[in-house]
């Protein structure tokens, strides 16, 4: 039995609140159960130096957690003067995931910066960030389209969503919360497009290795979960 009482293939309640920030071109408050992340998408009329005069744009991401988003207060990374390895890994993952479904040539020489700030953490912050970031990115591109800068359908090639899966109490489960994540025998994150393409898989065994059969079971859970998340994204932007 899962601590939350959920079935092995049951995700937490997921919601998207669009236009949460009045300043950003695109924004979304995404909730995966008790994990809440505020995502903003900001348009900048510039590109990284290595892309100048290439005709291509860029999508990048930053990720952070509020000090009291967790059980005990964490120090702000800014106070220590540097980002931790986990933060850098997650924000690169978010950026890679979004770029996988963006035509950078069609975006033109512009940069969209995605900021993911975890307000409350209960497991799955990176997967919630990616899934909510797609909404914020979509709305930023819609803002651009209303100003005749781009056509959304030419820039945004597909949906992208992410979900965690793992083996908890010897059972393959989807969308792990903190209690499950902290004691799971296997923990994996999957990033999958709306058309079923796999963008990234991160999998780690804690203690004993997991089998190919177990991995394929987790992949099956993830594909079903991401399909459900994409359906919720479509519903949110309708």
UniProtKB/Swiss-Prot annotation:
Record's catalysed reaction(s): tRNA(n+1) + phosphate = tRNA(n) + a ribonucleoside 5'-diphosphate
What keywords does the record list, in alphabetical order?
A: Nucleotidyltransferase, RNA-binding, rRNA processing, Transferase, tRNA processing, tRNA-binding
Query: Superkingdom of the source?
Result: Bacteria
The record's section on Pfam families has: RNase_PH (PF01138), RNase_PH_C (PF03725)
Which InterPro entries does UniProt cross-reference here? ExoRNase_PH_dom1, ExoRNase_PH_dom2, ExoRNase_PH_dom2_sf, PNPase/RNase_PH_dom_sf, Ribosomal_Su5_D2-typ_SF, RNase_PH, RNase_PH_bac-type, RNase_PH_CS
Which molecular-function annotations from GO does this UniProt entry contain?
A: 3'-5'-RNA exonuclease activity; tRNA binding; tRNA nucleotidyltransferase activity
- Top EC group: transferase
Give an example GO biological process.
Answer: rRNA processing
Binding of phosphate, residues: 86, 124-126
Q: What is its EC number?
A: 2.7.7.56
For this protein, the record's PANTHER family field holds: EXOSOME COMPLEX COMPONENT (PTHR11953), EXOSOME COMPLEX COMPONENT RRP41 (PTHR11953:SF0)
Which family does this protein fall into?
Belongs to the RNase PH family.
Indicate the quaternary assembly: Homohexameric ring arranged as a trimer of dimers.
Function as written in the Swiss-Prot or TrEMBL entry:
Phosphorolytic 3'-5' exoribonuclease that plays an important role in tRNA 3'-end maturation. Removes nucleotide residues following the 3'-CCA terminus of tRNAs; can also add nucleotides to the ends of RNA molecules by using nucleoside diphosphates as substrates, but this may not be physiologically important. Probably plays a role in initiation of 16S rRNA degradation (leading to ribosome degradation) during starvation.
Q: What is this protein called?
A: Ribonuclease PH
Q: Which organism is it from?
A: Agrobacterium fabrum (strain C58 / ATCC 33970)
